[in-house]
Amino acid sequence: MPKRTDIHKIMVIGSGPIIIGQAAEFDYSGTQACLALRDEGYEVVLVNSNPATIMTDTTIADKVYIEPLTVDSVSRIIRQEYPDAILPTLGGQVGLNMALALAKTGILDELHIELLGTKLASIEQAEDREKFKELCQKLGEPVPPSKTVKTVEDALAFGDEIGYPIIVRPAFTMGGTGGGICHNHDELAEIAKNGLELSPVTECLIEKSIAGYKEIEFEVMRDSSDNAMIVCCMENFDPVGIHTGDSIVFSPSQTLSDKEYQMLRDCSLKLIRALKIEGGCNVQLALDPNSLDYDVIEVNPRVSRSSALASKATGYPIAKMAAKIAIGMTLDEIKNPVTGTTYAEFEPALDYVVCKIPRFPFDKFPKADRVLGTQMKATGEVMAIGRTAEEAMQKAVQSLEIDEKDLYSAKAHKASDDEIEQKLVRPQDDRLFYLAEAFRRGYSLEDVHELTKINFYFLDVVKHMVEMEKEIEANPDDLDVLRLAKKYGFSDQTIAKLWHEYPDQVRDLRKANGIVPVYKMVDTCAAEFESTTPYFYSTYDGENESRKSGKKSVIVIGSGPIRIGQGVEFDYATVHSVKALQKMGYEAIVINSNPETVSTDFSVSDKLYFEPLTLEDVLNVCDLEQPEGVIVQFGGQTSINLAAGLERHGVKILGTTVKDLDRAEDREEFDQIIKSLHLHQPQGLTATTHEGVMKAADQLGYPVLVRPSYVLGGKAMEIVYSKDELEEYLHDHADIAEDHPILVDDYLDGRECDVDAISDGKTVLLPGIMEHIEHAGVHSGDSMAVYPPQTFSDEVEEKITDVTKKLALALNCKGIMNIQFIVRDGDVYVIEVNPRASRTVPFLSKITGIEMAQVATRVIMGESLEQQGYADGLAPEPEMISVKAPVFSFSKLADVDSYLGPEMKSTGEVMGSDHTFAKALYKAFAGAKMQLPENGNVLLTIEDRDKEKILPIAKRFARIGYRIFATKGTANFLKKNDLHVELVTKVHEDEQADDNILNELRDGKIDLVINTMGHDIEKNSDGFIIRQMAIQQNVPLLTALDTADALLKSLENRSFATDALK
């Protein structure tokens, strides 16, 4: 059926900020969908609150609204734009839930707006646990014994009836939010209560656990003519019981017999047809490893995280096809863009193995609960492609950018047998390394299977790699063993370690004997049809399929997996760098390992290499492509860390030189530059021993800021207020050494700001200064920021501009850089300089209209700022005021302290823009899901040193009609100052009392918590327990008084003053 001509304008709802469970995959799918709709001639209106995405670029849709994803806000845009239809199935769970909420308000019926793609009834049937169970039973498809409940009492009664373990699955949530496995009555009571609160329809499915079954996923497409096809079958390494987003996943399935595959395939197609889904959908199934029995787990009636993985694993662009199906086209009339000759109805065939491994945030949160279950905890993922499961898995481990570079973990090596068995039985994010360690200690496949329930085939893959380690170690410099090792994915670094050599020695031996990788094409059809996809992976098997073109080429290094401190913002910069290179006539080549992102869409660059971002893999691509050079400024710390090694091997680093990159990051060299330019910076000392750090802190006087050098996202950075706290910090971060010094800085309390600048060596352009709303001490990634600045004088802005220019020229910056300042008493202090793109690039690019990554790329390639039409100094400021607000995922991570400090904790961001600061703040808070009633109850739990500062804030809350709740000390202080305060008892005072602080939170009496009790790092401290309870109960929480002040500004703007005349 040809595309529809009765609709002209389509609204696409984006997925909002990145949180655990909903990461960059929706930027990728949303971007694809918008471009596909525009290709077909439709006018596209996009609504999304996330400025960090390619999707919210003005080139992606005809109209782009970066506005809060709330019913009010989206309804206002609908009334302004009058779209003919809305496409909600590409914005993750947020997009789906928004469509359902809009339908309930009646606006869609009132304005005759149609929902494209899967119909509302189908979405409800798939998402509503009870309706879905009834459908499966009607179709004769098996589901685990289960019951939908709306109260904790019903959950407990059903638990007693069917026995434990039990899985709780809240309705209409994503990433397993609020769910979990319960082994007893108490666990079920707690998880069911939490799940009911987090479900938008207060409903949970309680089902008998089938943990231990194989978990299989099918990515399925269907059109309105009932053509349906399987894009990809994926098999989880981990059995059922661990959320698929936290599981290692292989594609194609590795252990299914043809009979099992056809049985599960038929079930998936039967489900998508019965649900009448139009577009892409993900079917999750559980297969008994010992029989042909299976159960249907769930269907996601939308494009999902797995769809992004399936698209990259097969080369089949699911979101693009889903968008075309939504406008009435059928699979037999849509061309497959990979082959250009076959149609979209052909099921992809794979002649390689893909392995996905999740990337977890526990390097940032060492005290978090790391046990994996049905609630997702990973922030991102990596994917690798090889000819064998071993090769794909090894390459995926190398892509993770964690301490472990292969299957050997020093921590696992030190563990006792008991500890290893514990780790195998209760899976954590690092279980793979403990599996390998168990095999090194002689555990049999049967022993390990008994402990883990992981399929024997996958265990054999891990065991084979451990056996290969022994063979490599026993045969140093043996060429046959080297060939075999490379075939199974062992890196030069690992082989060098086993041979007690340097990686360069292994590389030289390899190259001298012609043991070099070939690059194979990902073509969706296992080479059955002619294909010209510029999408490659390396292997040591077969012929090379990547041919060097005659054009001059430049390699852009991506930023790897999404993690805290290095998010989708860096992918945004990578993609824009590619665009600039293409406009200048270069062949733009991307190397990256992240399946969720736009940069790994093969249609974005001229050539895509899906490879680990290690020195070895990047050098191998350089050896083949012989580029003009490599750009490292846009891939975050990942690419910067590769610069020195690449240069050492003769690869040209374009833009700022390696020597100058080092001068910015090396503390002593940087101090010299600051001194020579007569600039201010907080006094700081460097120490390489425990005693040295203690002495430095005494010399500077507390509080001090302590951190390791060379870090991203403020990792292991803390403000320390006493000797005891410093001792604890050093105990937690014991790896101080000559080459790992600790920096100790005088902590300056002032206004912090961020500047992104572009320099060509003569001219320095400052697109804008972003003022942080929180005082110094909160990491810039966790601070709210406003542009243009609201409290800086012209004189201060001039000083900031002057210092930026001096530093850019002194550091010989060529390209982009980021500087952070503290402004105190009119003086400007330099905190740090990052000689690369920062996470504020997308935000600032969108509000100033200066495509910073593109401008910087042109500078890197030799085009001056003047030639591009830019003048020296600060760019003119727009009339609109824009606020960037961080978004956190604390509800997904138990035991992570939500107190904000110099270590970054946010996973995403939103933006609010308007003509006044208060309105921009209101939109930013709304986008970050911090919408408060016009009057309500605020709980204040405040450090003694903050008591004076809280007084004006408390008075302002009282003036707009808020009731104030506080514990004894704060309450007495506020009462003395003529404020009416409701007294609550402390956490450990009378735990049964109705007015105990935790019971007040549990009973839903509190609308907002302001808690500044942050410097006790213990998990049983009052401050920590109150914060945890606020997060569990979904109560907005602030830990910085500046944020409370900003929130008040937005609330006051909505309220009317009621002041007596007398």
UniProtKB/Swiss-Prot annotation:
Q: How is the cofactor bound?
A: Binds 4 Mg(2+) or Mn(2+) ions per subunit.
GO molecular function list: ATP binding; carbamoyl-phosphate synthase (ammonia) activity; carbamoyl-phosphate synthase (glutamine-hydrolyzing) activity; metal ion binding
Residues the record lists as binding ATP 1: R129, R169, G175, G176, K208, I210, E215, G241, I242, H243, Q284, E298
Which GO terms of the cellular component aspect does the record hold? cytoplasm
Span list, region Carbamoyl phosphate synthetic domain = 547-929
Q: Which residues bind ATP 2?
A: R707, D746, L748, E752, G777, V778, H779, S780, Q820, E832
Binding site residues for Mg(2+) 2 = E298, N300
What catalytic activity does the UniProt entry give for this protein? hydrogencarbonate + L-glutamine + 2 ATP + H2O = carbamoyl phosphate + L-glutamate + 2 ADP + phosphate + 2 H(+)
Binding, Mg(2+) 1: Q284, E298
- Family matches, as InterPro entries: ATP-grasp, CarbamoylP_synth_lsu, CarbamoylP_synth_lsu_oligo, CarbamoylP_synth_lsu_oligo_sf, CbamoylP_synth_lsu-like_ATP-bd, CbamoylP_synth_lsu_CPSase_dom, MGS-like_dom, MGS-like_dom_sf
The ATP-grasp domain sits at: 133-327, 671-861
The residues that the entry says bind Mg(2+) 3 are: Q820, E832
Q: Which residue windows are coiled coil?
A: none
Name this polypeptide is given: Carbamoyl phosphate synthase large chain
User: Where does this protein come from, organism-wise?
Assistant: Lactobacillus helveticus (strain DPC 4571)
Gene symbol here is carB
